[in-house]
Amino acid sequence: MGKLTILVLVAAVLLSTQVMVQGDADQPADRDAVPRDDNPSGTDGKFMNVLRRFGCPWQPWCG
């Protein structure tokens, strides 16, 4: 009876690890996603976006 219990536990562990490994393969769907437009307002918006990210030397000008 003890060997049967160990066999069932080993089978359960193997199945659970298989499910975990196969479950991770479904996650990276974001790589194929269309990149979003970070600068919808064109070149001027891109410039202002860069200034906002790295800090603007003059706050009233940066908005």
From Swiss-Prot:
Note: Exists in two forms, due to cis-trans isomerization at 56-Cys-hydroxyPro-57. The cis conformation is the major form.
Cystine connections: 56-62
Major localization class: secreted
Molecular-function GO terms, alphabetical: ion channel inhibitor activity; toxin activity
Annotated propeptide span(s): 24-54
Subcellular location, record wording: Secreted
One Gene Ontology term, aspect cellular component: extracellular region
Signal peptide: 1-23
Keyword Signal found: yes
Role according to the record: Its target is unknown, but this toxin may modulate voltage-activated calcium channels (Cav) or calcium-dependent potassium channels (KCa).
Residue numbers bearing the Cysteine amide modification: 62
Presence of the UniProt keyword Repeat in the record: no
Feature: compositional bias, Basic and acidic residues: 28-39
Entry-annotated residues carrying 4-hydroxyproline: 57
Stretches for region Disordered: 23-44
One of the Pfam families matching this protein, by short name: Conotoxin
Biological source species: Conus stercusmuscarum
Modified residue annotations for D-tryptophan: 58
Alphabetical list of InterPro entries matching this protein: Conotoxin, Contryphan_CS
Keywords on record: Amidation, D-amino acid, Disulfide bond, Hydroxylation, Ion channel impairing toxin, Neurotoxin, Secreted, Signal, Toxin
Tissue note: Expressed by the venom duct.
Protein name: Contryphan-Sm
Superkingdom of the organism of origin: Eukaryota
Family the entry assigns: Belongs to the O2 superfamily. Contryphan family.
Domain remarks: The cysteine framework is C-C.
